[in-house]
Amino acid sequence: MRIIVLGAGVIGVTSAYFLAKAGHEVTVLDRQAGPALETSYANAGEVSPGYSSPWAAPGIPMKAAKWLFMKHAPLIVRPTLDPVTWRWMLQMLANCTSARYAVNKGRMVRIAEYSRDVLMQLRADTGIRYDERMQGTLEVFRSQKQLDGIAKDIAVLKADGVPFEVLDREGCVQVEPGLKPAAHKIVGGLRLPGDETGDCFLFTNALAKLAEGLGVRFVYNVDLKRLRRDGDRIAAVETAQGDYIADSYVAALGSYMPGFLAPLGLDLPIYPVKGYSITVPILDEAKAPVSTVMDEYYKIAITRLGSRIRVGGMAEIARFNKDLPPARQATLTLSVEDLFGGAGDQKKAEFWCGLRPMTPDGTPIIGKTKFGNLFLNGGHGTLGWTMSCGSARLLSDIISGAKPEISTEGLDLSRYR
């Protein structure tokens, strides 16, 4: 079958790879000059199934109200009268109940755990390298109240069979020796030894090369215009460079997917939640993190990527704004210097932002549409890297008519009807 994949981020490239492995003839179209040049470029670097949780959670509305008045807030909401923004935020608030949280988290953990298994098999089969580390993640808490608040998360981890360790201050320093000078600032932590880290940009580029070896054709610098329909099927992709025709089509356009598909009558509740990162070269190995340390107070992840430290986080509700305010960089710098002072060269920091494609319930949208040959793979939010391989393998099975290895319940667009 001839298949066109729209988008060459980590979701699009993994989709293309697994579709090619299944025997399909795949073409990938992207507006950028190469793979992973938008949201996949400099994310936090975590592959963290255990931390796959919806942002829409009990207590979040109250926390969000407090964050609005913090100098170094993890959430920034820019004032707007935009109806799309308000609709999405109201949908998210509707998911902030205990019952909805449990359902949504269960779906997210299902796809995330599967995705890690698929990634491990891919690594074993291909030897792909991407500054990867398999040394777990550690979430540190600065107050006893924060530490006590993880009870509901631990219950879910137990129910899902996810290995975890609750550590005291000394235990945190034992797994992350670089925390020793700042040990007095934390009270304990939650460690997930099965989590991984890695550079999503390196991974996506390496996988694109492997996909080319399977016959996948990548066409870059393409100005996508629209999908042309013929009844209940898609007939072609119209671009400024001409039409592209296939038997089936996969949309993996991240935050831009709702706008691109709206003319077809598809209503996708995916919103571009802006996140920031800085990447700094390591100055002192002894002071640097071993893997990923998540600062619960600032909602920031500090990740070791080879000879670099990636610091990523925050959430800004501002539509497609991609400004880089110095105040956001200051928050990232504050967090990493507070916990790993002197580990990285802040004078050489690379400051970046990306638009995470978020659904109001946190679960991605994977699968069929009302058009018989149009499929979706998007809305992964902050977990695109974590969920990429599993989402792609699942979608490949759906398109190929094979039986998926996990349940697809609650993962497609029909859950919003």
From Swiss-Prot:
Q: Does the keyword Methyltransferase apply?
A: no
What is the reaction catalyzed?
a D-alpha-amino acid + A + H2O = a 2-oxocarboxylate + AH2 + NH4(+)
Cofactor(s) demanded: FAD
Pathway stated in the Swiss-Prot or TrEMBL entry: Amino-acid degradation; D-alanine degradation; NH(3) and pyruvate from D-alanine: step 1/1
Q: What does the entry list as the binding residues for FAD?
A: 3-17
Enzyme's top EC category? oxidoreductase
Among Pfam families, the record links this protein to: DAO (PF01266)
Does the record bear Lyase in its keywords? no
Q: Which residues form the signal peptide?
A: none
A Gene Ontology term for the protein's cellular component: plasma membrane
What are the record keywords, sorted? FAD, Flavoprotein, Oxidoreductase
GO biological process terms, alphabetically, are: D-alanine catabolic process
MF terms (GO), sorted A to Z: D-amino-acid dehydrogenase activity
Q: What is its EC number?
A: 1.4.99.-
Q: Which HAMAP family match?
A: DadA (MF_01202)
Question: What is the purpose of this protein?
Answer: Oxidative deamination of D-amino acids.
**Family of the protein in this entry:** Belongs to the DadA oxidoreductase family.
Any idea what this protein is called? D-amino acid dehydrogenase
What organism is this sequence from? Azorhizobium caulinodans (strain ATCC 43989 / DSM 5975 / JCM 20966 / LMG 6465 / NBRC 14845 / NCIMB 13405 / ORS 571)
Q: Which gene encodes it?
A: dadA
